[in-house]
Amino acid sequence: MRLTFIPSLIGVANAVCPYMTGELNRRDEISDGDAAAATEEFLSQYYLNDNDAFMTSDVGGPIEDQNSLSAGERGPTLLEDFIFRQKIQRFDHERVPERAVHARGAGAHGVFTSYGDFSNITAASFLAKEGKQTPVFVRFSTVAGSRGSSDLARDVHGFATRFYTDEGNFDIVGNNIPVFFIQDAILFPDLIHAVKPRGDNEIPQAATAHDSAWDFFSQQPSTMHTLLWAMSGHGIPRSFRHVDGFGVHTFRFVTDDGASKLVKFHWKSLQGKASMVWEEAQQTSGKNPDFMRQDLHDAIEAGRYPEWELGVQIMDEEDQLRFGFDLLDPTKIVPEEFVPITKLGKMQLNRNPRNYFAETEQVMFQPGHIVRGVDFTEDPLLQGRLFSYLDTQLNRHGGPNFEQLPINQPRVPVHNNNRDGAGQMFIPLNPHAYSPKTSVNGSPKQANQTVGDGFFTAPGRTTSGKLVRAVSSSFEDVWSQPRLFYNSLVPAEKQFVIDAIRFENANVKSPVVKNNVIIQLNRIDNDLARRVARAIGVAEPEPDPTFYHNNKTADVGTFGTKLKKLDGLKVGVLGSVQHPGSVEGASTLRDRLKDDGVDVVLVAERLADGVDQTYSTSDAIQFDAVVVAAGAESLFAASSFTGGSANSASGASSLYPTGRPLQILIDGFRFGKTVGALGSGTAALRNAGIATSRDGVYVAQSVTDDFANDLKEGLRTFKFLDRFPVDH
């Protein structure tokens, strides 16, 4: 089935959203409250504060635990030493099974604020009043790598959000890419087994550049759409703060009276989208594999709270096949030209976890955490996730009571007949754990659509048909939308996609797999397939135009749009302790940029007053812009190793690797970053072969308002794409 865009629908993008017109019904009985304070009040019940306290055993008795109990100073340790046994036993059992996927992650608390009363489209209480606040917890993650892998692996990135609503927990368990690799959850083990390390040698970690991954991709072409997104900048974002988020599946909104709409969830970063380039990501991974979790933590600690807007695309139940594809297919997007996004509210992350394990590691998200006003669809991937995400927690937590952990507890009372199990934290007072009953007034009572504000399934949902094991014919076209994505990228980002696929398949050993990859790419775009083929030693194919089209859609790339905020970006000023003007210049620049949330870091040969870090600990990957200070140009002389030792090379120093200052400048330019120089520091640009006439290169005699404004504009551009060669 070929994706066909309906021209008459394009005008919808400019229409006023019908769900934001007129006076909406109010739910005045719901109070706002201070969601941030509520989070602290709730979690503080579970804090353990060791300040000014004596060491105790797990049962509270004061102890000392620095030496084992032995029979004499040189004798054997005694089995009766309960202090030793407790300490070692607890250490032996500290680890729990890591997540099968999304093991590597970072989280933060925050607040969601509703933009209005949306009770005309959903009965969800957290969207029932303008200004209503709801505590949230978000966990960002990679998918394939283990808990100890790098943040910078090329991967889909998880974006899971929990709303602690006044009607229970609601989770949007999404990603930073709006589609997924497979259409049916029964293929999930096959997908993950294919992308995980080999079973014989556990290689490679957190990478798909190997035979089994691309063998699966080329045999299961539903993967192509997500694959192209992952090979683009979306696979290697600048930070968690600079990604959008998506619910992936189509869900339902349901009103109090049972009317339903189909919706797709979108998180739009109010920082803007930004990505690294591949070599930059690889270097960052080697130098600081915690780069992204550190960026998120540091931004929140500095009070630069990242924000996202939550929106939905709203469609009628009858629209499931309207756009030329199936809304139940999780490998498809709904272009915003077809259905604009209705903004529902804003989320701000403003509080770091106090303990990583207790909060970020123990939090469990699942798409089955929904509330009144939200309902599922028949998306076969979603249906399978509803089982898998709940089931896996039994393995991770060793029992069914994981919802009782503080990070997982709802902020409202829990009343049901579930009892006992390992790790039961509560003391139920109702001895009659069954329903229906006459005791205790029949409590807990049944809540439904009309009584008790209970959850209810959309009344209009129906289904019929024969029992089959088959893919719906409406799911069959898996090439038109990958082409839509590829068509919509700017030339440089198309090149990044091509280079990424070349890199991955250059590591594939099987010529059969490589050839199959080219067959699938050729169904998307002949130029894409040919450019990859010639780099990996496969014959260039003739066009296979069945699914070719020239359609494009907006805002699917990570390049070509400016950042909305500069919060937490870093400018590295490359100076010298031999020239005090370096410190003065960095200080002046810091004053000019601080109101925009930009950090200025002065780098010099050694630590001294005003110097933030040394060249020995610095690389271009740490900065979003690089500026050479006046007087530091002697450190940037082009090094030569012919006919002499490293000590005799120009610009050499025993304080840092030879040529490090010049390398920082060159790499900054190569990675598309803003670069600049002050006064005599422009000589460093010449030594690096960087023309001052290039876009994103700024020079001035001293730090002026114009120079600072140029740097800010360069930071908003983020990557200057003319520095990256494109195939011809």
Swiss-Prot record:
GO terms for cellular component: cell surface; cytosol; extracellular region. Its main location: secreted. It is found in: Secreted. It is an enzyme of class 1 (oxidoreductase). Gene3D superfamilies: 1.20.1370.20, 3.40.50.880, Catalase core domain (2.40.180.10). GO terms for biological process: cellular response to hydrogen peroxide; cellular response to iron ion starvation; hydrogen peroxide catabolic process; response to oxidative stress. Keywords: Cleavage on pair of basic residues, Glycoprotein, Heme, Hydrogen peroxide, Iron, Metal-binding, Oxidoreductase, Peroxidase, Secreted, Signal, Zymogen. Its cofactor is heme. Its EC number is 1.11.1.6. It catalyses: 2 H2O2 = O2 + 2 H2O. N-glycosylated. Coiled coil: none annotated. Residues 1-15 form the signal peptide. PANTHER family: CATALASE (PTHR42821), CATALASE B (PTHR42821:SF3). Occurs in almost all aerobically respiring organisms and serves to protect cells from the toxic effects of hydrogen peroxide. This is Catalase B.
